[in-house]
Amino acid sequence: MGEGKKRVQFIMLDTRYDRSALVKASEPPPVMIPVVPPMPTTPILNATSNPAELKADDKAPPVPAPAPAAPKVIPPPPMPKMYVTNDDPKARVLSADQWKWLEGELKKPAELRIIVSSIQVIADDHGFEKWGNFPLERKKFLDLLNKNNIRNAVVLSGDRHLAAIAKIQLNKKTDLYDITSSALNRPSPAKELEVDQTYVGPSYLGINFGLATIDWS
């Protein structure tokens, strides 16, 4: 888009169609609630008699103890889908054809490259969908930017139900930003702001959208 010194390239990655399976984190065991044992059985005495003078046959039959209740199994509260890293060398986010296409796109001239990824590239402390679930693929992506001497790229990402801006040092001369915006109708139910070591400021949990303005001056 644009020409000359104002040429903007949009690269939109499909990070799900050919992606390997995510590895789910272990779920916590169900919570066992102990049951208070029933009181011991005691005979009911005749109220009009003196207990000291009662004979065995004068006593009312004992009240049978209630059957012990089975322990209640209360499942844990619903947890968001969380994942751990997939370190399989064959695991992938992009297919071989996608990687080849991406490298070809990065060789095209552009003053600004906006790379769109449905999942976050940089933020890696959370346990949801992200490039960090496939650390070898994430490294491959960053290495590809360095290999092609990309110094003018910005990543736009989503699927987090929050807004945040993350930054890493791509190399000694270049910082890479990942701007996350989502969602218009499904904000995060979390009560506390998400913290990530790469966030340049507080995350935002409310309904949000993002606008980008390019300053060519």
Which residues does each predicted region cover?
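Long, structured stretches of catalytic cores involved in phosphate-ester chemistry, encompassing
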Residues: M1-S217
